[in-house]
C-alpha cells in the first residue's frame, strides 16, 4: 500500500508537494490494500486461499483498528498521569498496559501477566502521540474503498 502511494505521489507531483502526513499515508496505503483484497477474493475459487485472505483481513482489522486504538488510549492515559504530576515508573506503566489489555480483550480472554511488559518493546511509544492515526486512517480507507466498490465511477468523481 505505501509503495504504490509513494510511487504515484512522486510520479504525479513535484517533489515539494509529494510528501504527506501519516494520516494521509495510512488512508492511501490501506485503501489500496482493501481494493487488492477485494480483487483477490473475487478471483479465487480456492477455499483455503479464501480463508487465508479473510483471516489476513481480520488480523489487519484487529491489529490496525483495535490494537492501535488501545495503544492510543495507553499513550493518552500515561500523558494524563504526567500532566497530573505523577511519576511514571515501570510498575505504573505495566499496570496500566495490562489493565487496558484486559479491558480491550474482555474477561473471556486469558491475558498473561507478561503482557504487562509489552509496552517497553513497542517503538511507537518512543515518539510523540500519533498511533491513533493508524486506526482513523484505516477506518477512512475501508469506508472509501467500500464506497468506490459499491458506487463505482460516481464515488471516484466525488
Q: What are these regions, as identified by a protein language model?
A:
Residues 12-21, 53-60, 79-85, 122:
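Short beta-alpha connecting loops at secondary-structure transitions
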Amino acid at each position: 500500500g505505501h509503495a504504490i502511494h509513494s510511487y504515484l505521489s512522486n510520479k504525479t507531483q513535484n517533489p515539494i508537494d509529494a510528501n504527506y502526513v501519516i494520516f494521509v499515508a495510512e488512508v492511501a496505503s490501506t485503501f489500496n490494500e482493501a481494493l487488492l483484497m477485494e480483487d483477490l477474493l473475487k478471483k479465487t475459487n480456492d477455499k483455503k486461499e479464501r480463508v487465508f485472505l479473510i483471516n489476513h483481513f481480520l488480523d489487519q482489522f484487529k491489529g490496525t483498528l483495535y490494537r492501535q486504538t488501545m495503544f492510543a488510549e495507553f499513550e493518552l492515559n500515561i500523558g494524563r498521569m504526567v500532566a497530573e504530576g505523577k511519576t511514571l515508573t515501570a510498575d505504573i506503566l505495566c499496570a496500566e498496559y495490562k489493565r487496558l489489555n484486559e479491558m480491550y480483550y474482555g474477561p473471556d480472554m486469558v491475558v498473561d501477566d507478561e503482557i504487562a511488559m509489552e509496552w517497553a518493546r513497542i517503538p511507537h511509544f518512543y515518539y510523540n502521540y500519533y498511533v491513533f492515526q493508524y486506526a482513523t486512517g484505516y477506518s477512512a480507507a475501508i469506508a472509501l474503498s467500500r464506497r468506490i466498490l459499491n458506487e463505482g465511477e460516481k464515488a471516484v468523481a466525488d
